[in-house]
């Protein structure tokens, strides 16, 4: 399912995302993910539990390649030890190959395979946005939070993003919650919409 969270600036939309990802801790109440209380978990534990997100302002490792930006998100899933890493033993080589194949698989969703070796900071704005989404997907989430994914995009890039988000839902069978001010995008892809104002649902 794709759901939208809309409302005016300052309504508390990003605060909701920050609460869901444990950037902020709620003063009372509980936060449930698949029936499990995730209140009090660290951001790493939240990610391990199945929540991944993007940000209003793009956060990439600009000096790393596109592929490296994706594989770095797979770190918690990698199972080789320090010795294997230093000596490049078979477990290291196998895990690195798996990470490479997974990164290329993700890049193929957005038709970005030919950008794998490009420096992330050199990508066009729209491609950087898509890369941030792919990096979040690399953590294998069950819930993907997209914070204004179309911000700064031109109509052509927004149309492409719309197709990308639908492809994510259909390919990964995950829930997507997005904050967005582009009402055309919201109306075109969201199956449910919640409106937030002054921190309250209306």
Which residues make up each language-model segment?
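Glycine-rich phosphate-binding loops of nucleotide-dependent enzymes
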Residues: 1-202
